[in-house]
């Protein structure tokens, strides 16, 4: 074995040991990040198993099997959530490196295109990780991880201070996606919702102004004033535009 082969062998051996140690750390950390099934998930599993009770022969063994499957389900969910955290951590570290002055401002975005099928999945994982590490306690981190994926991603991506997001986490724990999103829309509305509200308020103000102008116009027309052909044409155009819109 030549020198190059020896160096390669040592490198791969160290790399395997490092991967093995990382894997052990990650597996043990799954327990730390494990989450209980919420009431909706429990009920869904109960409904699933309810249809099987007609062939039941051993009640005690059956209940043990149900509990085992529920435990496995919660462990799978814990592994999935741990996967999102690990993914988010790697993206976070890559962004830190690629934001250095020696790289262009588009390098990180181009890197995401190379690595991920869709950028949205990468940004979801990144936002999830950033919110997770910003939470001030392990209890809050576990509560955040107990929230369904869609709700957690939405919460992480919404603009708002940490205090508000912590408050939202406490309120939506144990809720279904639909219920949690409704609460978030009230306490932490999206930028689009805020824009829609601004447009609505703008329309209200414009309608108020229009009302004043129309009332004044009616007053002038009803006063018997002689209308010039030009003004008659403008009124005709106004009526035609209104008919087209309505």
Curated annotation (Swiss-Prot):
<keyword id="KW-0614">Plasmid</keyword>
<protein>
    <recommendedName>
        <fullName>Virulence plasmid protein pGP6-D</fullName>
    </recommendedName>
</protein>
<dbReference type="InterPro" id="IPR005350">
    <property type="entry name" value="UPF0137"/>
</dbReference>
<dbReference type="Pfam" id="PF03677">
    <property type="entry name" value="UPF0137"/>
</dbReference>
<comment type="similarity">
    <text>Belongs to the UPF0137 (pGP6-D) family.</text>
</comment>
